[in-house]
Structure formats: structure tokens, C-alpha cells
Amino acid sequence: MARFTPLLMILLALVPLYYSLDCRKFSFAPACRGIMLKRSGGHPMIAEQQPMIDNAKAREVQMMELLIRNIEDEALIANSDCVSMSWLRDRLVNAKNEMPQ
């Protein structure tokens, strides 16, 4: 029994440290892993990227509307029911290259 007394004392000294572990400071400690993930909510990086994605989608819709209007105007000017595929392809490529970053 005397052999295990130091081991038991060390174990009893470490138990309060385990329960007093600050999970805000050591979020990846095995005892804190589940707690901090449940409390954190959404990741801030995702919240920052969502408006950028929405803005990109809005710009894409505006660009497509502008291209459709330009194609319709060019078709009316040319008095033609069809627009050539090469002209349409060139127009789309040029519009994509001119799009502000």
C-alpha cells in the first residue's frame, strides 16, 4: 500500500486541476473539445464570406441582365431574328474580362 501512496497523492492533486480547466483558454483540451464547439455557434469566417457571396451573385445577375439587353438591342439594330454564336461568345468573354474584381 505504501508504494501506491505517492501515485494516489499525485492523482488527487491533479483532479481539481482537471475540473478547473478554463475551456476558453484551452479550447482544444480533451475535456473542453465538445463544450467549446457547442458554445461557439457559427464560425466568424463563414459570417464574413456570406455577404461577399451575396454581392457576387447580385453582380452576376446584373451582368446577365445587361448582356441580355445589349444582345436584344444589337439584334433589333441588325434587323435579324438570330444573333450569331461567334458574336455572342465574343460578347460574353469581353464582358467577363471587363468585370471589376
UniProtKB/Swiss-Prot annotation:
One GO BP: response to pheromone
Record's keyword terms, sorted: Chemotaxis, Pheromone response, Secreted, Signal
Expression by tissue: Expressed in coelomocytes, the ASK sensory neurons and interneurons AIB, AIM and PVQ.
Signal peptide extent: 1-20
Phenotype of null mutants: Suppresses the olfactory plasticity defect in nep-2 mutants, which are defective in the plasticity of chemotaxis to benzaldehyde. Double mutants of snet-1 and daf-22 suppress the daf-22 mutant olfactory plasticity-defective phenotype to levels similar to wild-type.
Entry GO terms, CC: extracellular region; perikaryon
Record has Cell inner membrane as a keyword: no
Compartments reported by the entry: Secreted; Perikaryon
Record's keyword annotation contains tRNA-binding: no
Post-translational modification: May be degraded by the nep-2 peptidase.
Function noted in UniProt: Negatively regulates chemotaxis and olfactory plasticity which is the change from positive chemotaxis to dispersal after prolonged exposure to an odorant. May be down-regulated in response to pheromone exposure, resulting in promotion of olfactory plasticity.
Protein name: Protein snet-1
Lineage: Eukaryota, Metazoa, Ecdysozoa, Nematoda, Chromadorea
